[in-house]
Each structure stands twice: as structure tokens, then as C-alpha cells.
């Protein structure tokens, strides 16, 4: 919708968005890989819809008070890639680290707001990354997908919830890949802050 009608629009994204992304699913007939990557080619987006890509891997400010995470370092020992997500590079298929999953930080009057994509790097890694790059020690809100729904209850969930506490997050608004069970756990932990 942003690129239609066709006109020149700057799009900041990770160069990995055009990789051959696959998801492994267990079917009755056995395990199979399905394409889940970008539905449109770089050529179509740039020549057909006039997207002006600014492919970035590093943290940067993309507008006044709007920060692009870039590639988030995987530093915690409890946040791991989803083994069912794969990437094909030439003829090799391997677990996708999902380096192209991007989060944003937006400065607001109430404080910094973190918008998570799916937090494939792990929510704690994302929050720590923004803390290191901006100096913020407190976030007003964390909104978006946490990918915790695929991990289930356990160490990663507990440490992620503790990070929300440690960073004094005022508003917790998790979505899609967090899952209903983990969303309910978040609500029970932070009923006054959950949305």
C-alpha cells in the first residue's frame, strides 16, 4: 500500500529481505519446506513501483526521532533462532538467523517506544541493542511480535518478562507471533500495563 500508486518512495530495509526464505512444516505426508520470503522481486519493486531502497545493516536514524535497529547482535545465551525457519544460499539450506528482522524505536513525548517486527533476535537482545545505541535505560512502550509463542513457557519467556520489568516498560502490547498463551501470561504478569 505504501508503494501504490507507483511513485518514488524511500524504503529502508535490510539487504537480506530478498533472500530465499523457507519454513519447515510437518505434513501428514512428511516434512516439507515452503517459501515464505518476499513475494516481489527487487526489480519489480524498484522498476515497477519506483521503490528507492536504502539497504542498511547498521543502527541508524531514518527520520527525526525514528531509529532503525539494523542487524541486532545475538548476545544472550537463552534466545535462539527458530529451527523451523530456513534460508537457502545457492545450494545450501541452513537455519535462518533472520538478520533482516528489523525493529524501530520512536521518540515520543511519553518516552521511547519500541516497535518489534517479530523479534527473531530475541526481545531482550533487541531492547539491549536499543539501550546501547541510544543510551535509553527505560522504554515507554514495547509493541509488536515477540516470537515467544514458538518457544513456549521457560527461561526465554521469564528473562524476557524480567527485561520488561528492568527497562520499566509502561505499556506492553504484544501481538501475532507472541501467541495467545504467552500473551495471556504477559497480561497476568503486567495487568495494569498490558494492552
Predicted segment positions?
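Secondary-structure boundary elements
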Residues: 3-7, 51, 60, 132-137
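Di-metal (Zn2+ and/or Mg2+/Mn2+) metal-binding site signature of metallo-dependent hydrolases
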Residues: 1-4, 18
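Cap/insert and terminal regions of metallo-dependent hydrolase folds
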Residues: 9-12, 94-103, 107-194
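Metallo-beta-lactamase
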Residues: 17-102, 165, 195
Amino acid at each position: 500500500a505504501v508503494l501504490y500508486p507507483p511513485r518514488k518512495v524511500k524504503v529502508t530495509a535490510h539487504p537480506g529481505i530478498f533472500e530465499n526464505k523457507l519454513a519447515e512444516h510437518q505434513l501428514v505426508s512428511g516434512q516439507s519446506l515452503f517459501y515464505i520470503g518476499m513475494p516481489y522481486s527487487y526489480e519489480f519493486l524498484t522498476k515497477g513501483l519506483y521503490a528507492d531502497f536504502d539497504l542498511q545493516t547498521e543502527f541508524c536514524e531514518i527520520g527525526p526521532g525514528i531509529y532503525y535497529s539494523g542487524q541486532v547482535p545475538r548476545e544472550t545465551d537463552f534466545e535462539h533462532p527458530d529451527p523451523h525457519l530456513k534460508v537457502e544460499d545457492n545450494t545450501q539450506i541452513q537455519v535462518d538467523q533472520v538478520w533482516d528482522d528489523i525493529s524501530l524505536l520512536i521518540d515520543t513525548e511519553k518516552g521511547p517506544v519500541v516497535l518489534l517486527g517479530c523479534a527473531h533476535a530475541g526481545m531482550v537482545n533487541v531492547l539491549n541493542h536499543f539501550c546501547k545505541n541510544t543510551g535509553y535505560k527505560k522504554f515507554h512502550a514495547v509493541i509488536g511480535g515477540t516470537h515467544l509463542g514458538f518457544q513456549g513457557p521457560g527461561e526465554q519467556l521469564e528473562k524476557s518478562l524480567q527485561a520488561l520489568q528492568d527497562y520499566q516498560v509502561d505499556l506492553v502490547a504484544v501481538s501475532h507471533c507472541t501467541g495467545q498463551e504467552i500473551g495471556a501470561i504477559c497480561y497476568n504478569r503486567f495487568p495494569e500495563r498490558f494492552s
